[in-house]
Design a protein with these regions (language model features):
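N-terminal cap/lid segment of alpha/beta-hydrolase-fold proteins
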Residues: 1-11
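Conserved loop-alpha-helix segment in the C-terminal half of the alpha/beta-hydrolase fold
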Residues: 194, 199-237
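Catalytic active-site module of serine/aspartate enzymes centered on a nucleophile-bearing elbow/loop
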Residues: 229-263
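Active-site loop/oxyanion-hole signature of alpha/beta-hydrolase fold enzymes
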Residues: 52-98, 251
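Conserved HGGG/HGGXW glycine-rich cap/lid loop of the alpha/beta-hydrolase fold
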Residues: 9-64
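Flexible "cap/lid" loop of the alpha/beta hydrolase fold
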Residues: 108, 115-143
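Alpha/beta-hydrolase
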Residues: 143-205, 221
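Hydrolases whose catalytic domains are alpha/beta-hydrolase-1, hotdog thioesterase
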Residues: 102-106
Length: 263
């Protein structure tokens, strides 16, 4: 089922796949400014539960908002509105990169409405991320494209990545983050939820690639802060293990959802 959520700020496109009886999996893409495309493989989990994907406002198939509107609150309001619109009372929440930041903010506000939290290639402290990205960039001779090929996605011949790059909104990235991963000039400058991580008492899974922008130091911050978090590392992946090691990624997510629901 595809649909559109109409709001004053603009239309939000969404897709719900599957009608199984298990708790829905709600997925938050990264960026800021990217699209749902590289998350589409998660719909293979829809044989047992609804899988919900959407393009955040300003991105992909959703309506472009005005540049002055960009803020964390804007995207949190959109997420709340979408859950209300789709009657998603209790969900597993999965966020990658920026989507993981959004997932953390949402979980800190609405923990009781979540069954579990999956944090994929993400962070709790923007300054730490920028510092680690700068370190990684300094280790890569060559261009920024060479850096991205090593730490974002290691196989350029991928339809989902091509579509995402064609439909993403770089203005959102610039306004929310900045010109690159190691320079924060946007609304997320100073973003830091480390002190609040112990508030999260729900089951949590931290996922990352061995060559990820989400480095061991960044992951350690999440694992030490969230009481019931555990980690899985994908040895052949960088920042997009859902594409780089799809079968293992999906099996890992499925097994985690099972384990939570069996409690």
């Amino acid at each position: 089922m595809e649909g559109v959520l109409e709001r004053p700020i603009g239309r939000t496109w969404y897709r719900v796949t599957g009608e199984g009886g298990r708790a829905p999996l709600l997925c938050l893409h990264g960026g800021p400014g990217s699209t749902h495309n590289y998350f589409a493989r998660l719909e293979r989990l829809a044989d047992e539960r609804p899988v919900v994907l959407y393009d955040q406002v300003g991105c992909g198939r959703s309506e472009r908002a005005q540049p002055g509107d960009w803020s964390v609150a804007l995207f949190l309001d959109e997420l709340d509105a979408l859950r209300t619109h789709l009657a998603l009372e209790s969900v597993h929440l999965l966020g990658t990169s920026w989507g993981g930041m959004l997932a953390l903010e949402h979980a800190l506000a609405r923990q009781d409405s979540l069954v579990s939290l999956i944090l994929s290639s993400t962070l709790a402290d923007a300054a730490q991320w920028a510092a680690e990205a700068k370190r990684l960039r300094d280790e890569v001779p060559g261009t920024d494209d060479d850096f991205e090929a090593r730490h974002f996605y290691r196989n350029p011949d991928c339809l989902e990545i091509t579509r995402m790059r064609a439909e993403r909104n770089k203005d959102v990235y610039q306004a929310m983050w900045g010109p690159n991963e190691w320079t924060i000039t946007g609304a997320l400058d100073g973003w830091d939820v480390r002190a609040r991580l112990p508030e999260l008492k729900l089951p949590a899974l931290v996922l990352r690639g061995a060559h990820d922008l989400s480095t061991p130091a960044i992951s350690k911050t999440l694992l030490e802060g969230i009481p019931h978090a555990r980690e899985v590392v994908f040895d052949a992946s960088s920042h997009t293990p859902v594409l780089e090691e799809t079968e293992r990624y999906l099996a890992t997510v499925r097994a985690f959802l099972y384990s939570v629901e069996a409690r």
